[in-house]
Amino acid sequence: MKSQNKYSIRKFSVGASSILIATLLFLSGGQAQAAEKQVNMGNSQEDTVTAQSIGDQQTRENANYQRENGVDEQQHTENLTKNLHNDKTISEENHRKTDDLNKDQLKDDKKSSLNNKNIQRDTTKNNNANPRDVNQGLEQAINDGKQSKVASQQQSKEADNSQDLNANNNLPSQSRTKVSPSLNKSDQTSQREIVNETEIEKVQPQQKNQANDKITDHNFNNEQEVKPQKDEKTLSVSDLKNNQKSPVEPTKDNDKKNGLNLLKSSAVATLPNKGTKELTAKAKGDQTNKVAKQGQYKNQDPIVLVHGFNGFTDDINPSVLAHYWGGNKMNIRQDLEENGYKAYEASISAFGSNYDRAVELYYYIKGGRVDYGAAHAAKYGHERYGKTYEGIYKDWKPGQKVHLVGHSMGGQTIRQLEELLRNGSREEIEYQKKHSGEISPLFKGNNDNMISSITTLGTPHNGTHASDLAGNEALVRQIVFDIGKMFGNKNSRVDFGLAQWGLKQKPNESYIDYVKRVKQSNLWKSKDNGFYDLTREGATDLNRKTSLNPNIVYKTYTGEATHKALNSDRQKADLNMFFPFVITGNLIGKATEKEWRENDGLVSVISSQHPFNQAYTNATDKIQKGIWQVTPTKHDWDHVDFVGQDSSDTVRTREELQDFWHHLADDLVKTEKVTDTKQA
């Protein structure tokens, strides 16, 4: 009898417990749904439909499971309900505990919602953050979620069973799979961690706000159940990172489709920062041709390189000619830039006179359309106006200076320009007074204090026998001008700088008409060209018209590449002389005046050192103004060694050429301490 009573009491206890579980099922289920509605109020209607369809699917699966195990849940619930009133005290106590638990959950939900908003704001501020930093943040959030989950599990231990049953009807979008009832709690906990980490890593390549939402929802849904992989292999965060393109798949087809659709609807692609990529590419790119800022240059006054006779810049030169400033050895101007010196290559006429070239040099620096002057154009019979230059130093004026460095005839051209700036052109001034009209500021004079220094390299200040004996012959001039005429056609890019003489085909002019017109040009009988100015007569005329400026530093560099013959006083060309100059070098070496024989292949040493009628001194460390400072003659240096055009010369190396120009540029910077009027 006693055993029967014990059995009845045990049966009663089981029945009361079942009633309690059923009651908690309905109460907590309704309250959990209310809590989820509050948290997910902002979610789209699509999320709600998706979650409901998933819940329905899982409910059907649970029903099937119960039928397979022979459990009649409905009948069992009805039998237990009849005895509900037998233990009101226990039921009320459990109701109270359930209410307290739901309140705690609602508080946690509110905290999670606030944390979610904060994470979204932080993520918005750091959209351009390093992906590595984002990964670290996600891992930290996962760890925090795990810790929060353990604490939450301890608080809700009493209602664990009811939560597990209710989860099937209220499974949120963050966890799309479920666990089999046969799994124990430790397996459930492990699989919850894996799936939540998987979901976070799956969203990581997408919008960071979505990823942070999942971290927050991870804490809210810490009791949700997932179905394990068949092989039950433990996954780590690092494994998931390496397989972001193939995350853990849901076990059901409907779950897979619903999950993917929700991700597609809420995902926003995070595009690379294009500006950052461009800045990085620039930073890593080649810096060879980078131009330093004005404040970073060693020289205050720009250096302007002025080429000589038959000189061109690369954009207009015949293809058979090497780069003028450096040849194949180096680009002198670019090398100066790379080493902190602001420098330019002037582009002026290759065969024009010193006067025409000086005018062109002025406009090359200042900018504007070339005006050769009305009087000059009328005197020599060519066009008054020439090409238009953009200008490299548009603010060039008294007080704003430049360094002028001229090679060969370029040294004469520089001297002519300085004379025009300081004293103007008396002929142009008189012509303008008589005929009125405009006059270029260059010809008015009173433009002193615009040149800091004048440096010449192998310049025939007193002319050269090479031009006297060969260059000024009618046959030679005819050949050269014919070449200029040929390259003057409208389809040619080569420019000999003789357009003012008509040696440039007009756009609508046939080539036959162009040739006929050129034959009538005054160029063929004029002295207004480079051939004449390079003769000793032409150079002497320039020396009479020019003078030294007491405010300018003058310096000359001279080379020689000949040696005395064995049986005479004549000079013979050295073996390493630039081959085209061997003939002219030997001709000059036979000159009647012995002092003119030593030469660099084109220019005699005595002519390159200084103009005969102007003061000079040997160059020293002391910088002097208003006088030619003559540097020691550089032996075994021919006419083009100063500019590195002889690529076959193994004696003169690139390093030697580079050292020469660095030393020259450094000297120019030192002269600014003497010529800078701003310091006075």
From Swiss-Prot:
Residues 35-290 form a propeptide. GO terms for cellular component: extracellular region. Its EC number is 3.1.1.3. Gene3D superfamilies: alpha/beta hydrolase (3.40.50.1820). Its main location: secreted. Residues 1-34 form the signal peptide. It is an enzyme of class 3 (hydrolase). GO terms for biological process: lipid catabolic process. The keyword tRNA processing does not apply. Keywords: Calcium, Hydrolase, Lipid degradation, Lipid metabolism, Metal-binding, Secreted, Signal, Zymogen. Residues 40-58, 162-193, 204-223, 235-246 have a biased composition (Polar residues). It comes from the Bacteria. InterPro entries: AB_hydrolase_fold, Lip-like_C, YSIRK_signal_dom. One of its GO terms (molecular function) is metal ion binding. Residues 84-112, 224-234 have a biased composition (Basic and acidic residues). Ca(2+) binds at D638, D641, D646, D649. Disulfide bonds: none annotated. The active site is at S408, D600, H639. It catalyses: a triacylglycerol + H2O = a diacylglycerol + a fatty acid + H(+). Residues 39-58, 82-260 are annotated as: Disordered. It holds the Pfam family Lip_C. Belongs to the AB hydrolase superfamily. Lipase family. This is Lipase 1. It comes from Staphylococcus aureus (strain MRSA252).
